[in-house]
């Protein structure tokens, strides 16, 4: 499954919607996504499982890439 993760680049500042970034992670569950990202230096706001149709749409963006540690 592919998950879209919305996050802020820093843990030290209050989250601001306009600064929200996103990345895509392949994992078995939302819990696994959070475990994979727990040591990263950013604040996770939301993790969303995306549908096949949503994934196809996102892949049309030339900047689309799965996160790799």
UniProtKB/Swiss-Prot annotation:
GO terms for biological process: DNA-templated transcription. GO terms for molecular function: DNA binding; DNA-directed RNA polymerase activity. Keywords: DNA-directed RNA polymerase, Nucleotidyltransferase, Transcription, Transferase. It catalyses: RNA(n) + a ribonucleoside 5'-triphosphate = RNA(n+1) + diphosphate. The keyword Nucleotidyltransferase applies. InterPro entries: RpoY. It comes from the Bacteria. GO terms for cellular component: DNA-directed RNA polymerase complex. It is an enzyme of class 2 (transferase). The keyword Transmembrane does not apply. Belongs to the RNA polymerase subunit epsilon family. RNAP is composed of a core of 2 alpha, a beta and a beta' subunit. The core is associated with a delta subunit, and at least one of epsilon or omega. When a sigma factor is associated with the core the holoenzyme is formed, which can initiate transcription. This is DNA-directed RNA polymerase subunit epsilon. It comes from Listeria welshimeri serovar 6b (strain ATCC 35897 / DSM 20650 / CCUG 15529 / CIP 8149 / NCTC 11857 / SLCC 5334 / V8). The gene is rpoY.
